[in-house]
Amino acid sequence: NRNITRYELAQEEILSCCHEGYRLGFRTFVLQGGEAPAVKDEGMVETVAAIRQSFPDCAITLSLGEKSREAYERFFLAGANRYLLRHETCNEGHYHRLHPAEMSLSHRLQCLDWLKEIGYQVGTGIMVGSPYQTVDHLVEDILFIERFQPEMIGMGPFLPHHDTPFSSFPPGDMELTLKLLSIFRLMHPAALIPATTALATLAPDGRERGILAGANVVMPNLSPSHQRAKYSLYDNKASAGAEAAEGLLKLEEQLKGIGYEVSKERGDYENGELTVDN
């Protein structure tokens, strides 16, 4: 997408967002960014270290794409606990149809192995209904996730954006997404599995349906409100303008309506079990 306005948050802005989240009771923070030269490793190390120093009782999750092993090690030593890197597809041919020629499935899987070896709680996952995806591809993904045994599984429906090469492809199917979510929950009872914003974008009750299908994580947006609209991954993205506090109140009401309560604890995955303090 060459028409989107890209942005980078300064360390002071990120820390301010974390302070607001901490005030609201959040004890885990997710820092997500594109695979771009603007996201310098040294600056990220400093930011992670600053968050760790300010919030020693919080979990720090990074989602910054493919990096060198050295970079992953430096982030970990600075204080990061978790890293989310969706493998997206385990089929080599399908992977090449989704990515630029300079990217490879083998390197992405190598990154996942590095992350696990370093000691991160590692997340991987898929996009359901991505262009050219088949049922056989999904079976390969299920088998890979069973072998890899991630602590986190990120998955949601594909949603097109009008300024991308895949703009003409239909969105992923809600029911198939929910079925796969349930399969992963049965396979991995303690895994952290988010009910993604993409679900809420595909259907008004998508987030609640995701929770009922087996998701156990939701991620309110703490980014500065003036930047959120620029984070345009797909068309009609849900909640681009809601403030964090307003979003939390709405979220608590939504979950209460289906019989759930919000826990703001770290939710660490230890020895195959999810630990949450009540």
Locate the predicted segments by residue.
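Conserved, mostly hydrophobic/aromatic
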Residues: 31, 85, 115, 145, ...
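Aromatic-anchored, glycine/proline-accented short structural segments
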Residues: 111-160
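Auxiliary Fe-S-binding modules of radical SAM enzymes
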Residues: 146-278
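Catalytic cores of alpha/beta
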Residues: 68-77, 130-145, 200-213
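Short, small-residue-enriched loops and turns at beta-alpha junctions
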Residues: 35-40, 101, 129-134, 166, ...
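Generic structural signal for helix capping and beta-alpha/helix-loop junctions
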Residues: 38, 70, 92, 132, ...
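Alpha-helix-loop-beta-strand connector modules within alpha/beta enzyme cores
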Residues: 39-64, 102-123, 148, 168-191, ...
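Core AdoMet radical
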Residues: 1-15, 21-42, 47-48, 52-112, ...
